[in-house]
């Protein structure tokens, strides 16, 4: 979730939205419209992160100025300038700045039906291969390989078309994205991309259930035991699952989730800091401020002031 963003918005480009997720961590933000289900984002990053989430849409991220860290399931990617990643539908992922300094990213989130509905040849030939069981979770894109270079160029062209909105830009963006899906589909046939094993898929689905439990109970006292019990795991197995998939402990995730909820309330309400902390599961006001500062690099009061000053 972006904090104190400096958004390079123009034309059809948006500032990245705050991640609003349902109980399984699935993002609920609508990207684009029902008629044209794509949205493109630009972000000049100072202190930037996108919490763990997933959505039905495909997503591409391009590092205009790196480095950026993109976590996809159990894999951590560092995107250098000029590199990109295409993330498949339904895959857990998160984004953060890799090093101190500024990073600029361009990203796009689009629903598969932008290319064609399920009853079209476009779905059967271009989309279905990517949605099959065992399909790659993501494709790392680098200009050093011919097909990846073409894919990156098409993604940037699609992004720019949505940004500038020239005549017939919808068709241009759709054409470029269809080309990308053709390239990715060919890689699926050749065994390319980073695939997810059945065991990893089971672990990811179990993680979604645990994220849902945190979403539903974050205002209550939460322990590793309670989180583990929601999927019939032992505490040690729960800890191992979080560390392997998210790189953090369950309680660290709970803290991050509570802070993001608190940040949302600081932006959208006039509740006092203490009230917000209590609503988000922090029983001690001083601990809330300390935890918020650790994760957001400012106090809740400063966060609200900076948001209001934008």
Tell me what each language-model feature is.
Residues 48-54, 96-98, 118-119, 169, ...:
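Short histidine-centered beta-strand/loop micro-motifs
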Residues 90-113, 120-122:
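Ligand-binding loop in jelly-roll beta-barrel domains
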């Amino acid at each position: 979730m972006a904090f104190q963003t400096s958004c390079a918005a123009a034309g059809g480009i948006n500032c990245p939205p705050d991640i609003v997720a349902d109980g399984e961590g699935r993002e609920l933000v609508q990207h684009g419209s029902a008629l044209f289900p794509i949205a493109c984002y630009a972000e000049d990053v100072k202190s930037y992160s996108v919490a763990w989430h997933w959505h039905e849409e495909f997503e591409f991220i391009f590092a205009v100025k790196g480095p950026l860290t993109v976590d996809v399931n159990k894999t951590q990617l560092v995107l250098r300038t000029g590199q990109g990643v295409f993330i498949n539908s339904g895959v857990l992922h998160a984004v953060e700045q890799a090093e101190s300094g500024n990073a600029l990213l361009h990203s796009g989130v689009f629903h598969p039906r932008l290319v064609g509905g399920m009853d079209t040849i476009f779905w059967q030939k271009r989309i279905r291969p990517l949605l099959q069981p065992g399909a790659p979770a993501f494709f790392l894109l680098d200009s050093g390989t011919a097909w990846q270079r073409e894919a990156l160029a098409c993604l940037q062209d699609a992004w720019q078309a949505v940004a500038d909105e020239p005549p017939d830009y919808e068709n241009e963006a759709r054409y470029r994205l269809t080309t990308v899906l053709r390239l990715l589909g060919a890689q699926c046939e050749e065994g390319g991309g980073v695939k997810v094993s059945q065991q990893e898929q089971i672990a990811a689905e179990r993680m979604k259930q645990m994220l849902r439990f945190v979403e539903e109970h974050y205002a209550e006292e939460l322990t590793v035991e309670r989180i583990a019990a929601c999927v019939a795991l032992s505490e040690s197995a729960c800890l191992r699952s979080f560390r392997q998939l998210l790189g953090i402990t369950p309680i660290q995730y709970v803290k991050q989730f509570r802070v993001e909820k608190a940040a949302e309330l600081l932006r959208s309400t006039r509740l006092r800091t203490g009230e917000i902390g209590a609503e988000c599961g922090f029983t001690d006001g001083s601990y809330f401020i300390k935890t918020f500062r650790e994760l957001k690099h400012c106090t809740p009061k400063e966060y609200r002031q900076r948001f209001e000053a934008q």
